């Protein structure tokens, strides 16, 4: 399966305005869209949103998103989830027509997509940078009580 890179993270937050003050004001993510209860942000190097904040009763990670190389990779991931007995569903979101959401065996909420709406290039708008001026989201840090087992699973199943 052709996973290209980390694509996005969606966080449930208890206070959207306080979270925006942190991610946008302090860290320097760029706000691209805000609607009732949701905000979409990105780093200055990115051409699509990479951080979605959603107002919720409790703070949590809703999904860890990965971009795949081809449409066929989404089909292969659906087959993988089905063969493993993992719950999955298809959804759409702003700028992304099809997102495959999968709950992995270790409890992580994963998401996979191929196409995303391209946003305007803003990398050289240095006057707009805030804080450290985040360029991109490029990795996730995950904690697991079974690190070896989780690592082996991902290497064997998802490459």
Question: What is the predicted function of each stretch?
Answer:
Residues 1-17, 61-66, 117-148:
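N-terminal beta-strand motif that seeds the catalytic metal site of vicinal oxygen chelate
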Residues 1-48, 91, 101, 142-159:
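Core segments of cupin and vicinal oxygen chelate
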Residues 15, 45, 55, 68-70, ...:
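Non-catalytic surface loops within mature trypsin-like serine protease
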Residues 24, 75-78, 82, 155:
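Class I S-adenosyl-L-methionine
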Residues 30-62, 109-116:
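Conserved short beta-strand elements that form part of the metal-binding/catalytic scaffold
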Residues 51-60, 64-69, 74-78, 89-92, ...:
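DNA polymerase sliding clamps and clamp-related checkpoint/processivity subunits
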Residues 71-75, 93-96, 131-134, 141-148, ...:
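Short, amphipathic alpha-helical segments
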Residues 78-136:
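Vicinal oxygen chelate
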């Amino acid at each position: 399966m052709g996973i290209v890179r980390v694509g996005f993270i969606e966080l449930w937050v208890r206070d959207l305005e306080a979270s925006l003050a942190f991610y946008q004001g302090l860290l320097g993510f760029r706000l691209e869209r805000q609607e009732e209860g949701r905000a979409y942000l990105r780093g200055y190097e990115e051409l699509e949103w990479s951080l979605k904040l959603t107002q919720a009763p409790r703070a949590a990670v809703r999904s860890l998103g990965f971009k795949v190389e081809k449409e066929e990779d989404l089909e292969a991931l659906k087959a993988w989830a089905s063969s493993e007995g993992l719950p999955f569903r298809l959804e759409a979101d702003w700028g992304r027509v099809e997102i495959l959401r999968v709950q992995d065996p270790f409890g992580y909420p994963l998401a996979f997509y191929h196409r995303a709406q391209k946003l305007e290039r803003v990398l050289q708008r240095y006057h707009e940078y805030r804080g450290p001026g985040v360029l991109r989201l490029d990795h996730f840090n995950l904690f697991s009580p079974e690190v070896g087992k989780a690592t082996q699973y991902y290497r064997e199943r998802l490459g």
